[in-house]
Amino acid sequence: MDQDAFFSERDPEAEGETPRKQESLSDVIGLLDVVLSYKPTEIGEDRSWLHSIIDNSKENKPSCKADDNNKDRAISTPTQDHRSSEESGISRRTGESKTETHARILDQQGIHRASRRGTSPNPLPENMGNERNTRIDEDSPNERRHQRSVPTDEDRKMAENSNKREEDQVEGFPEEVRRGTPLSDDREGRTNNNGRSMETSSTHSTRITDVITNPSPELEDAVLQRNKRRPTTIKRSQTRSERTQNSELHKSTSEDSSNLEDHNTKTSPKVLPSKNEESVATQKNNHNHRKTKYTTNNANNNTKSLPTPEHDTTANEEGTSNTSVDEMAKLLVSLGVIKSQHEFELSRSASHVFAKRMLKSANYKEMTFNLCGMLLSVEKSLENKVEENRTLLKQIQEEIDSSRDLHKRFSEYQKEQNSLMMANLSTLHIITDRGGKTGDPSDTTRSPSVFTKGKDNKVKKTRFDPSMEALGGQEFKPDLIREDELRDDIRNPVLEEHNNEPQASNASRLIPSTEKHTLHSLKLVIENSPLSRVEKKAYIKSLYKCRTNQEVKNVMELFEEDIDSLTN
């Protein structure tokens, strides 16, 4: 932390006090002479002036007890030490020479002024009140340079090391605390000392010089509480780190709690003890043991009460996420995307898994992460389906082309087979029609293969035979058919018309024949009459049986009488 930046943040209240605090160089030189004139034995033995100041401050002890809460708040936490360790390390390397000289002057001024004002009625509550109001937000660069430990047998060592510590304080060098490790330049030694780092008495901050006063019982309690080990705070930091490493769901809530704790540590006032205060504080370790117990119990209660709202919120989020997952499964079942709700819960497809994670996410960061994963998985699945469809279309196109080629070849083959079948049918037809013979089947005579001009075919002349007229052209027919046809000597004109129609040629209609047409017309007249069907058949039969015109006339007269009887 830069020194100029630190002085730019001073309060107007502190600026008003600076003219009073800046004293001449002669006072500082006088203070150095007084301190150097003491012998080590005198410094170790004579402590009557310390006891006199403590007795004077006992008169105002009830007023000091009113600020117990403020003293508890003045105790620094490991988060403060870890927070300010890196800043103090950086600033110590950059401006070490300036800060040490300036801090030595102010430190000597404060000690000299405290020795002169030793008879003040109530120095500590006034200083504590000023410290509470000013509220130092950041640590000074010269603070927390070395570790501290719990003092146990320090009364014996105080007398031995008092001379050395006094000289170090006057010279401005950082002292080495009893039972503590020596100074180390690396940052890890300062950050990992579990809150045991101790602020040196030399500081350049003008706002906190009032704190460096003569010791009092209340200030000793604060020093003891600072030097006390706090395993509960270590456990709290460990549990916080484990929570952030194990589960990402509690990340946002743990950040909020850590930010809140940093804010509290920044706004809490700080008390910087001096060497004399630390020496007197060792004598009252047993007296203030109960107070340190009370503070550690409070710290335990605070640490126990912190993670409970986080677990409650996560439980509520899990309950709501389960209901949202169930609602999503029901919606998918109703839309027909999946068959059952159980199938959605057991499904291992990427989009379904990301959807379930998104519905169960605790904050917006995880929700957006899972939403992006779901969209990418859906896009990937769609691309896979598109590729599958493309391959299927290619296969179908190839099959269509091959089927076209097959159809073309098959049609050509079919045409060839059809032509062969037609040729075979034509040859079979010729063979069956001629009976296996190429010539005329009716011609039984043998015809010469070569015709000459000199020869002509002679027509065979048949002599007249009177029996040929009776036989007609039936000389080759069998006797049964001939006998059947010759048996009917009576010529029936109706039967003759019916039988001779298929054999009649076109020239036969030119010959006048009155009977055929009259019988046909009479038949049509009888069929169109209103008589019954049986009567019509009877009249037609009688017409066919008529042999002369007179019989036909008689039949038609009877027909007319029946028609007249029906009409009348």
Swiss-Prot record:
Gene3D superfamilies for this protein: 1.10.287.340, DNA helicase RuvA subunit, C-terminal domain (1.10.8.10), Viral phosphoprotein oligmorisation site domain (1.10.287.320)
What segment(s) does the record annotate as region L protein binding? 412-445
Q: Does the keyword Phosphoprotein apply?
A: yes
Region entry Disordered: which residue ranges?
Answer: 1-25, 55-322, 434-455, 494-513
| Molecular function GO terms recorded | RNA binding; RNA-directed RNA polymerase activity
Note the superkingdom of the native organism.
Answer: Viruses
Q: Where is this region: Multimerization?
A: 344-411
Name the InterPro entries for this protein: Paramyxo_PProtein_C (IPR002693), PProtein_oligomer_dom1 (IPR043097), RNA_pol_Pprot-P_XD_paramyxovir (IPR016075)
- One GO BP: DNA-templated transcription
Please name one Pfam family that this protein belongs to: Paramyxo_P
What segment(s) does the record annotate as region N0 binding?
33-41
Which SUPFAM superfamilies is this protein grouped with? Multimerization domain of the phosphoprotein from sendai virus, Phosphoprotein XD domain
Cite the residue spans of the region called Interaction with the nucleocapsid (N-RNA).
Answer: 479-568
Keyword Acetylation listed: no
Compositionally skewed regions (Polar residues) per UniProt: 191-216, 441-450
| Compositionally biased region (Basic and acidic residues) | 7-24, 56-105, 132-144, 151-167, 175-190, 239-265
Q: Which UniProt keywords apply?
A: Coiled coil, Phosphoprotein, Viral RNA replication
Residue spans of biased composition, Low complexity class: 294-304
Q: Which residues lie in coiled coils?
A: 387-416
Q: Which family does it belong to?
A: Belongs to the respirovirus P protein family.
Assembly with partners or alone: Homotetramer. Interacts (via multimerization domain) with polymerase L; this interaction forms the polymerase complex. Interacts (via N-terminus) with N0; this interaction allows P to chaperon N0 before encapsidation and form the N-P complex. Interacts (via C-terminus) with N-RNA template; this interaction positions the polymerase on the template.
Task: Relate the protein's function as given in its record.
Answer: Essential cofactor of the RNA polymerase L that plays a central role in the transcription and replication by forming the polymerase complex with RNA polymerase L and recruiting L to the genomic N-RNA template for RNA synthesis. Also plays a central role in the encapsidation of nascent RNA chains by forming the encapsidation complex with the nucleocapsid protein N (N-P complex). Acts as a chaperone for newly synthesized free N protein, so-called N0, allowing encapsidation of nascent RNA chains during replication.
Q: What is known of its domains?
A: The N-terminus consists of a long intrinsically disordered tail. The central part contains the coiled-coil multimerization domain (PMD). Forms a four-stranded coiled coil structure. The C-terminus constitutes the alpha-helical domain that binds to the nucleocapsid (N-RNA complex).
- Protein name, entry field: Phosphoprotein
- The record lists the organism as Human parainfluenza 1 virus (strain CI-5/73)
